[in-house]
Amino acid sequence: MSIDKSYCGFIAIVGRPNVGKSTLLNKLLGQKISITSRKAQTTRHRIVGIHTEGAYQAIYVDTPGLHMEEKRAINRLMNKAASSSIGDVELVIFVVEGTRWTPDDEMVLNKLREGKAPVILAVNKVDNVQEKADLLPHLQFLASQMNFLDIVPISAETGLNVATIAAIVRKHLPEATHHFPEDYITDRSQRFMASEIIREKLMRFLGAELPYSVTVEIERFVSNERGGYDINGLILVEREGQKKMVIGNKGAKIKTIGIEARKDMQEMFEAPVHLELWVKVKSGWADDERALRSLGYVDDL
């Protein structure tokens, strides 16, 4: 009697902030797991997205963008999370943006050169490159930087060539037992996903200054008798002025954030959600490693 083979492995998605790593992960999984926003520092946790297709299970580690800037405790911890996820995977997807190449990209590349895992280079946002003639020389420049397993021009937004990446990933999964049941898409709890959804909406609806100094704590997450969930979210900011910004004129801003977050939660949890949000000032949390640990920023380091 023959036993069917199964394949399973970990894949890190790395790159500097804002190159489209989370969008790529969401496309590879076919749904939204990692929060996406146009602001740097959106992904703060190593979210694991799981894609199971028949005998193949790919477990994606979505790293925070690696930063040159290491001043604040939160940035140091984010860099540590990104670096540690490179070390223990079968394959790395290194995401860069179009024809842009920055010192941050160079820093990520140097970390990858030290690693043992093969690296796929995903050149994202190629549909946004104005001068198409610049693309080929840039790809040749990238190819000369490291012995990449493959170089794939993609658009994570539209899905262009994302299937190519998925096929390469499948080909490099080692023979192994699946780590998760096939219907799992993430190992994060619903409570964690709720806080991520609220944080995404904060980023989407607020100015550039705020995201660096805001976090979300879920104080209550319970099933109710209506077959849904009652969720209380506490939004922590560093200054009184930021609290006013989050609440908005006569509470308009926080109301919008709550409505949009509730829609996403209901879609993700497939159940009605009653959501209440509060805003509280907790100064200096982004500089305090103890506070960060209590908020779950180093739960996997």
From Swiss-Prot:
- Cellular component annotations (GO), alphabetically ordered: cytosol; plasma membrane
Location of the region described as G5 in the Swiss-Prot/TrEMBL record: 154-156
Q: Name one GO biological process term.
A: ribosomal small subunit assembly
Q: Note the Pfam families from the entry.
A: KH_2, MMR_HSR1
Q: Does the keyword Transmembrane apply?
A: no
The similarity comment for this entry is: Belongs to the TRAFAC class TrmE-Era-EngA-EngB-Septin-like GTPase superfamily. Era GTPase family.
Protein name per the record: GTPase Era
Q: Which organism is it from?
A: Escherichia coli O157:H7
Q: What is the lineage of its organism?
A: Bacteria, Pseudomonadati, Pseudomonadota, Gammaproteobacteria, Enterobacterales
Gene from which this protein is expressed: era
